[in-house]
């Protein structure tokens, strides 16, 4: 029953956006939820340099980020950015140079740009002993102080050594992929190697199709889904371009990005 209901809702949503232009946008990898770019974009939006961000659905793609950086550039022509905000802008513009060049028409052929995007090495210490905390009675809980936005990984007691790398990019205009291997060591689990995130992304017309494992933030706040939880393996459909619902029973949504996942 639930599957039929989901299929019916999906069909209704697809029908509601059937008027979307048939041109196929560029497919790019997503920006991981733990990227500092999200705080940069939020700050640019809060300061009035970006006005076109649909709320509630993350991660955003690299192409989305590039569009918003171009929007911020246009606004900054009449409203100069403060120094700290200019630093954020310059960092993102340099990283998204290929996507921006494509949007500006400077690069008609978007070739393979899969590369090592980020490397992280982290040393963490966690005190897992309940006796270290001043409670009169013990409580039935597992202690994970200050462990947040960690894709569901738990710290071991004592010293934790963690390393990971993000490899991502587009193979061509129609196919992108991302892979994030992770290694950690602590005295509880000793060595642990895993794939933190990994997915392929393509499209069917204006619908993006993603298959794999990645962290998702859903809704106005990360209550139900966020990178506090373990990334789930899923099939996700979404509009590569946000759509404005001008009429029909979904008119109340206004501008939104439709997402369906299983």
Residue positions per predicted region:
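Transmembrane beta-strand segments of Gram-negative outer membrane beta-barrel proteins
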Residues: 33, 93-179, 256-260
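Solvent-exposed, acidic/flexible segments
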Residues: 30, 34-37, 58, 62, ...
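Outer membrane beta-barrel
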Residues: 168-261
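Short loop/turn motifs that connect adjacent beta-strands in outer-membrane beta-barrel proteins
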Residues: 30, 54-56, 76-87, 104-117, ...
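Glycine- and acidic
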Residues: 24, 49-51, 146-150, 220-222
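N-terminal propeptides
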Residues: 4, 14-16, 20-53, 64, ...
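Outer-membrane beta-barrel domain signature
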Residues: 55, 150-156, 186-189, 224-226
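Bacterial N-terminal signal peptides that target proteins for export
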Residues: 1-9
